[in-house]
């Protein structure tokens, strides 16, 4: 993509951490419980539907007791997450903050959780075109089936320009950071020929609503 490309870049800051909702946690595949760990009051998670209220069980030599499975994030608490890179591998760490107390919940491979979300939500564009996941995530889509040179922006049809507006809106209103590189080669037999590379902050893709918006844009010219 060395020539004839159109670029939309928002050089904001990739967030160190981000707040999430219960619907996001459920999409990741977890229930949130209030109970005790080794007799101490705590919040913790288990896989959706795996544990029940009143249940005692052991993990890693520690005893867990579930007093109540939460239907929403408690009003005095925040569900937070961040991406860390350790020995070349990304991890999603998430925890619950209740006033001055922090309850670690899990540390997981973000690639596994994102795949789980995208499969559950049927976000096939994200599943098909993801290329790399770290602090940022790269998508690459090559939909060029003709021999041609990229067209200048002035020759883009209205539908293509609408896609670019949608990308700007995502960067401005939802992620604050992003880089979208686009080449358009024209329309042949009602098929748009284009190539794109899109970089977004990974944390935002754990938000179910944002993931749906990104998937929609990736498929707008198909």
UniProtKB/Swiss-Prot annotation:
Protein name: UPF0128 protein PYRAB08320
InterPro entries, sorted: UPF0128 (IPR005266)
Domain of life (superkingdom): Archaea
Family (UniProt): Belongs to the UPF0128 family.
Any Pfam family: UPF0128
Organism from which the protein derives: Pyrococcus abyssi (strain GE5 / Orsay)
């Amino acid at each position: 993509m060395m020539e004839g490309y159109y670029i939309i870049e928002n050089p904001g800051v990739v967030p160190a951490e981000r707040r999430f909702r219960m619907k996001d946690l459920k999409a990741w595949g977890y229930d949130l419980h209030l109970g005790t760990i080794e007799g101490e009051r705590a919040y913790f998670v288990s896989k959706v539907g795996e544990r029940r209220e009143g249940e005692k069980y052991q993990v890693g030599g520690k005893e867990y007791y579930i007093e109540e499975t939460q239907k929403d994030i408690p009003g005095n608490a925040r569900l937070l997450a961040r991406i860390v890179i350790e020995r070349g591998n990304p991890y999603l760490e998430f925890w619950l903050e209740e006033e001055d107390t922090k309850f670690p919940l899990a540390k997981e491979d973000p690639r596994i959780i994102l795949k789980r979300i995208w499969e559950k939500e049927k976000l096939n564009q994200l599943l098909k075109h993801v290329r790399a996941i770290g602090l940022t995530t790269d998508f690459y889509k090559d939909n060029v089936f003709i021999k041609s040179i990229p067209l200048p922006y002035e020759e883009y049809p209205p539908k293509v320009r609408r896609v670019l507006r949608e990308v700007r809106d995502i960067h401005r209103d939802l992620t604050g950071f992003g880089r979208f590189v686009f080449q358009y080669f024209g329309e042949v037999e009602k098929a748009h020929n284009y190539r794109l590379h899109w970089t977004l902050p990974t944390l935002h893709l754990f938000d179910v609503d944002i993931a749906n918006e990104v998937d929609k844009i990736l498929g707008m010219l198909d």
